[in-house]
Amino acid sequence: MTVYHFVGIKGTGMSSLAQILHDMKHTVQGSDYEKRFFTQTALEKRSISILPFDKSNVKEGQVIIAGNAFPDTHEEIVAAKELNIPVHRYHHFLGDLMNQYTSVAVTGAHGKTSTTGLLAHVMQGAHPTSYLIGDGTGHGVENSKYFVFEACEYRRHFLSYNPDYAIMTNIDFDHPDYFTDINDVFSAFQEMALQVKKGIIACGDDEELQKIQAKVPVIFYGFGEDNDFQARNIQKRTDGTIFDVFVRNTYYDTFKITGYGNHSVLNALAVIALCHYENVDVEAVKHQLTTFEGVKRRFNEKPMGEQVIIDDYAHHPTEINATIEAARQKHPEREIVVVFQPHTFSRTEKFLDEFAESLSKADQVYLCDIFGSARENKGELTIEDLQKRIDGAELITDTTTDVLKKHKNGVLIFMGAGDIQKFEAAYVKEVQVAEK
C-alpha cells in the first residue's frame, strides 16, 4: 500500500492536497512544525497523522510531496534522496494529478480563493467535483468529472499547470518582493494563458486582461457592454445581491448571490460563464449560488453583542476597497471600523499611499505593527509612516484592544494576511472577561 508523505503538510495548498488524496482512499501522512496552524483542523477530522519533522519519517515505498517553502537541504528531503525516493514538489504533483479530470484553474491577483470556493460549490451541484482551495480546504471524489483548483501567480508557480480551463479574475501588481512591475506580472499571466487547453474566462473590465493572447477562445465577463457575459440591473441589498446576466447582449437569466460588493458579482459572473460553456444546468447554478456560505478568512462574520466582527484576509489596497464596500452594502447604517495589519515590509512600502487611500474609506482605522516575512529585511519603514497618512488612525496592540468597545454599534473588520486573528481573539477575550 502506497503511503503519501507530505513534507510541510500544514501549508494551505499542501493541507488541501492531502485532504483530496485521503478522500480518494489513499493513505496519507505528513510532517511539519509543531506550532498549531488553522489547517490542522481539517486534517485532524480525517485522522491524517501529523508528525514532527524527522528524517526517520521517510521510508522506502512512500511517495514524497514537499512544500515549496522547504529547501532541498531539509532533513526529510535529504533522507528521501539518500533512499533514492523521488521528491515531488507540491505544484508539480498537483499539475500531474489534474490531468485525470476536466481541470479548471482559478487565478488572478485578487479573488482567487473566493471564486475557487464558489465554482467548486456550484459545480458540485451538477457533477462530481474535486477541489483545492487556497484557504486550506480540499475535497476529493473518486469518480470526479471536474477538478477545480486555485492557481497562484507568485513566483510563477501556476506555470506548472496545463489546465483545460482558466478563470482569470484580474491582473494587478502585488508581491513586490518577486515581481518588478505590472508588466512582469502580465508576462506571467500571458505565459499561463498559452498553456490553457480549452478556454479562458477572463474579466473584460480589467485593462491588463484585455491584452491577453491565447490559442483557445477567451470569453470576457464584467459590467462593461463589450463583454460576452455582462451583469446588468444590479440590486444591492442587505441580504445579498440580485442581477441579470446578458450573453452577447441577449438576456440569459436572473441570479441571486449571497455575496456583497461588485467583486462578488464579478466572481459569480465568472462561474456562470464557465458553467454556460460546459453546459451545466442553469437551474442547478442558480440554486447553488444561493446556498454558498463563503470560504475561510474571506468576509467571515459573527455577531458579538451589539457589534459585528468580520475576519478578512485583505492585504492589498484593491482588496481593502472591496471588503469595505461589501461591509457598507450589508450594514449601511453602521459605523465601519477597520483593524488592519500590513503584511510584509516590501508590500507596505510599495503601496503606502494606496493603503492610506483605501483604508480612509472606513469610518475609523486602527493599525497593528507590520507583519514581516521571514524572507525580508525590515528596512526603515515603520507603521507610523502609514498612520500619518490616514486622518485619525490609531495604533493598536493585542493588549490595547479594549479601545474597540467604544464603537458600540460598529462593524469591526480585522483585516490582514499575517496573524491579525490574535488581535481579534484578544478583543473577544477582553469583551468576555468584561461581561463576567
From Swiss-Prot:
Enzyme Commission number: 6.3.2.8
UniProt keyword Transmembrane helix present: no
Keywords: ATP-binding, Cell cycle, Cell division, Cell shape, Cell wall biogenesis/degradation, Cytoplasm, Ligase, Nucleotide-binding, Peptidoglycan synthesis
Gene Ontology CC: cytoplasm
GO terms (BP aspect): cell division; cell wall organization; peptidoglycan biosynthetic process; regulation of cell shape
Compartment(s) where it occurs, according to its Swiss-Prot or TrEMBL record: Cytoplasm
Keyword presence, Nucleotide-binding: yes
Chemical reaction(s) catalysed: UDP-N-acetyl-alpha-D-muramate + L-alanine + ATP = UDP-N-acetyl-alpha-D-muramoyl-L-alanine + ADP + phosphate + H(+)
Family named by the database record: Belongs to the MurCDEF family.
Protein name: UDP-N-acetylmuramate--L-alanine ligase
Lineage: Bacteria, Bacillati, Bacillota, Bacilli, Bacillales
